[in-house]
Curated annotation (Swiss-Prot):
Protein name listed in UniProt: Small ribosomal subunit protein uS8
One Pfam family, short name: Ribosomal_S8
Record GO biological process: translation
Family: Belongs to the universal ribosomal protein uS8 family.
InterPro entries linked to this entry: Ribosomal_uS8 (IPR000630), Ribosomal_uS8_CS (IPR047863), Ribosomal_uS8_sf (IPR035987)
Any GO MF annotation of the entry: structural constituent of ribosome
Lineage: Bacteria, Pseudomonadati, Pseudomonadota, Alphaproteobacteria, Rhodobacterales
Coiled-coil spans in chain: none
Organism annotation: Cereibacter sphaeroides (strain ATCC 17023 / DSM 158 / JCM 6121 / CCUG 31486 / LMG 2827 / NBRC 12203 / NCIMB 8253 / ATH 2.4.1.)
Amino acid sequence: MSVNDPLGDMLTRIRNAQLRGKSTVSTPASRLRAWVLDVLQAEGYIRGYEKKETENGQGELVISLKYFEGTPVIRELKRVSKPGRRVYMATKDLPSVRNGLGVSIISTPKGVMSDASARSANVGGEVLCTVF
């Protein structure tokens, strides 16, 4: 099956797994997905992830989801920049998610990072998604 938006597919898998109360979810591996998961883990939205090899050689990422008192830690997960409409922002224009309670994940020339890290590094880039 062909997926036009691999990152959007991963975010949807995470959202659906949390709605069902699953402890883990798997998704095909890619570097961009792993970088986004690194930011989610650093910000405390997931427990972690590990890469496992599959028979076809591509590999998969097994994501351990995080809950607090039975409710998902991630309340809202939105894709901002989509394949049909890319969204780029300068440092001064980076959005604040829910008055600073959430996080935007930005793809910058210095790598994938949170909005706070991008502001401190004074770099802008493509706004991949927002998490609250």
